[in-house]
UniProtKB/Swiss-Prot annotation:
Belongs to the RecR family. CDD domains: TOPRIM_recR (cd01025). Keywords: DNA damage, DNA recombination, DNA repair, Metal-binding, Zinc, Zinc-finger. The gene is recR. May play a role in DNA repair. It seems to be involved in an RecBC-independent recombinational process of DNA repair. It may act with RecF and RecO. Disulfide bonds: none annotated. One of its GO terms (biological process) is DNA recombination. A zinc finger (C4-type) spans 56-71. GO terms for molecular function: DNA binding; zinc ion binding. This is Recombination protein RecR. The keyword DNA repair applies.
Length: 199
């Protein structure tokens, strides 16, 4: 264990997802040996992100303005809405270049064990978006794990009375995996082969 601010830095870096103690230590010593201008730039960017980035008022994706670039793009198909758990999932699907509709970011998935229920997600906002009848197809692109499946089933049942076609990404994605780790080809095929959910 180190003393003072270097240990504080290691501890803070270790709180980041995917960064274990060894990685945190390696990053801390990289920062320590880096040019002060690089470190200053990193600090500025971190602060800038916290100050300038917000969530899109429409879909919940990350944005620098009130609307994200996807919601602001009139070329996107407003009749197809893809529901994802997190903004990183939007990026994963966008990389496929197969989807031309719009998104709705839930902000997570239903997970009773973690104390996350439907009221903790952006489901109310989703229903508001569906209310005007513009959306004809709702693609449920939640992660193919227990929480993602539970969320998809919940949403499918909730939306069924609205008469919107509800589909789920096709298989091919590994069960228990996260969308952000799927390669573009697999994710693209999953989008092409999506199926309707019968609940």
């Amino acid at each position: 264990m180190y003393e003072g601010v270097i240990q504080d830095l290691i501890d803070e870096l270790g709180k980041l997802p995917g960064i274990g103690p060894k990685s945190a230590q390696r990053i801390a010593f990289h920062i320590l040996g880096a040019d002060p201008s690089q470190v200053r730039r990193l600090a500025e960017v971190l602060l800038d992100v916290k100050e300038r980035i917000r969530f899109c008022a429409i879909c919940g994706n990350v944005a620098e303005h009130e609307q994200c670039r996807i919601c602001a793009d009139p070329r996107r198909d407003p009749t197809v809405l893809c529901v994802v758990e997190e903004p990183k999932d939007v990026v994963a699907i966008e990389k496929t270049r197969e989807f031309h509709g719009r998104y709705h970011v839930l902000g997570g998935a239903i997970s009773p064990i973690d104390g996350i229920g439907p009221d903790d997600l952006r489901i109310r906002e989703l229903l508001q978006r569906l209310a005007d009848g513009t959306v004809k197809e709702l693609i449920l692109a939640t992660d193919p794990n227990l929480e993602g499946e539970a969320t998809a089933t919940y949403l499918a049942r909730l939306v069924k009375p609205l008469g919107v076609r509800v589909t789920r990404l096709a298989s091919g994605l590994p069960v228990g995996g996260d969308l952000e780790y799927a390669d573009e080809v697999t994710l693209g095929r999953a989008l092409e082969g999506r199926r309707q959910l019968d609940v």
